[in-house]
């Protein structure tokens, strides 16, 4: 499972994937435990 320490990495990963799907990834991608 993901913890608060994983959020900076995930945020950086999302910022590399700037696109129309970014918001959906933010909402659902990080919840994929």
UniProtKB/Swiss-Prot annotation:
GO MF: hormone activity
What does the record list as GO biological process? G protein-coupled receptor signaling pathway; response to food
ATP-binding keyword on record: no
InterPro entries, from UniProt? GAST, Gastrin/cholecystokinin_CS
Q: Which GO terms describe its cellular component?
A: extracellular space
Q: Which PROSITE patterns match?
A: GASTRIN
- Where in or outside the cell? Secreted
Modification type Sulfotyrosine: residues = 28
Which keywords does the record carry?
A: Amidation, Cleavage on pair of basic residues, Hormone, Pyrrolidone carboxylic acid, Secreted, Sulfation
Residue list for modification Phenylalanine amide? 33
Tell me the residues on which Pyrrolidone carboxylic acid occurs: 1, 18
Q: Which family does it belong to?
A: Belongs to the gastrin/cholecystokinin family.
Protein's job: Gastrin stimulates the stomach mucosa to produce and secrete hydrochloric acid and the pancreas to secrete its digestive enzymes. It also stimulates smooth muscle contraction and increases blood circulation and water secretion in the stomach and intestine.
What is the name of this protein? Gastrin
What lineage is on file? Eukaryota, Metazoa, Chordata, Craniata, Vertebrata
């Amino acid at each position: 499972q993901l913890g608060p320490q994983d959020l900076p990495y995930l945020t950086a990963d999302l910022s590399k994937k700037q696109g129309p799907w970014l918001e959906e990834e933010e909402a659902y991608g990080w919840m994929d435990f």
